[in-house]
Amino acid sequence: MALPASMRLRGHRCFNRLHRIGRRHHGDWMVLRVMPEEPRLLRPELRRHPTRCCRCALVISSKVSKRAVRRNRLRRLLHQHLRQQLEHRGDLAGRWVLISLRPEASEAEPSQLLEECDSLLSSAGLGQ
């Protein structure tokens, strides 16, 4: 199941800001960036509806897999996992998270990706 709209991070200004100043946590198959939210970078309609959780985004480029089916499966897997991990944690409100998969991620088993995602979330102070 996809992330609800209230948990999604959208817009190139948000992504650029996360890439520039976000705190990085590196794993074998992904990089997690996290930073405090900056509502002024959000679109006006999103600013009016503050979220009770952090906002998340996934970047899965065509370098991970040339096949859109494979990239979409990875995206759905990680969206579902993030939703389960972060949805009911009010203490995480006010943070933005960006997860970028590395090209090697296509060779990893789904369980390995989820395990690494958990360890990166924990190292960023977002895990349980």
UniProtKB/Swiss-Prot annotation:
GO biological process terms, semicolon-separated: tRNA 5'-leader removal
GO molecular function, one term: 3'-tRNA processing endoribonuclease activity
One of the record's GO cellular component terms: ribonuclease P complex
Keyword tRNA processing: yes
Keywords on record: Endonuclease, Hydrolase, Nuclease, RNA-binding, tRNA processing
This enzyme's EC code(s): 3.1.26.5
One of the Pfam families matching this protein, by short name: Ribonuclease_P
Catalytic activity line of the entry: Endonucleolytic cleavage of RNA, removing 5'-extranucleotides from tRNA precursor
Taxonomy, superkingdom: Bacteria
InterPro entries membership: Ribosomal_Su5_D2-typ_SF, Ribsml_uS5_D2-typ_fold_subgr, RNase_P
Family to which the UniProt record says this protein belongs: Belongs to the RnpA family.
Quaternary structure annotation from Swiss-Prot or TrEMBL: Consists of a catalytic RNA component (M1 or rnpB) and a protein subunit.
Record function comment: RNaseP catalyzes the removal of the 5'-leader sequence from pre-tRNA to produce the mature 5'-terminus. It can also cleave other RNA substrates such as 4.5S RNA. The protein component plays an auxiliary but essential role in vivo by binding to the 5'-leader sequence and broadening the substrate specificity of the ribozyme.
Protein name, UniProt field: Ribonuclease P protein component
Gene expressing this chain: rnpA
